[in-house]
Amino acid sequence: MHTDDRSWITLRQDADTGIETIRAHFEGHAFDPHWHDSYLIGFTEQGVQQFSCRGALHKSTPGQIFLVEPGEIHDGDAPVDGGFTYSMLYLEPAWLARELRTLDDTPLACGEPGFDRTLTERPQLLSAIANAFHALEQCDLRIVRQTALDTLLLNLSGHLRWRQERQDDPRLPRVAIRAREYLHAHFDQDIGLDELAAVTGVSRFRLSRAFKAAFGLAPHAYLIQLRLARARYLLARGQAPAEVASILGFADQSHLGRWFRRAYGLTPAHYRTRCSNLPDD
């Protein structure tokens, strides 16, 4: 969680597409490991942006593009003085897949889009991302926003691979997969390790080791990320932070706020206000 007063973040959500635009500056530690349900497409404007993703440590510098798929765990730090500034688009998976399929007369293969690389340097793609970002952030004319997004999609299509919808890696321990399924089905409940161990038929210690090795997070951290992803969804649709905290099993609004800020760098109330255009509670 960032605490430096020099850090800041601005956010806007496009009413037509649901795309979020985020521009932020962080000094020191930016955010804890987390994931998003969206595709993240952005670029570093200034400084060095260091983050872990796909089991590797990446350092993005000005002009570099970063591409993160839904569900990919990543964090963020500023390893040098002066911090880093970035601009980013959050693209909903259903919107991206649907729009990509309209690019050609011939339908694309079934499946979902993915990125071959987390970091890349493509001047034409960088320009397309920046133009789409500014058109959405400035709430430009609808025809301007749509043209900028079409240009982005055309440039992005050359850097995507289409794959079958994700299947579990057969090498993953069955106990880890079963525990993950249980967490997804009961993420709003007060789940204990004993309960997960009983469901999977192994000890708490074996389960915790297998789960973290498989998914990169301990069971409790994974559960929190599930709740935070749902919290973003509910807040963006106007539900009050206190209500969201209660629905998702957080102890109270401040408990939700602490975890939300550690993952995303802003408060639930700020996120709700920027996405829903409702007054801050």
Language-model features: locations:
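A short, Lys/Arg-enriched amphipathic alpha-helix from helix-turn-helix/homeodomain DNA-binding modules
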Residues: T118-A132, Q146, Q164-T200, Y222-A240, ...
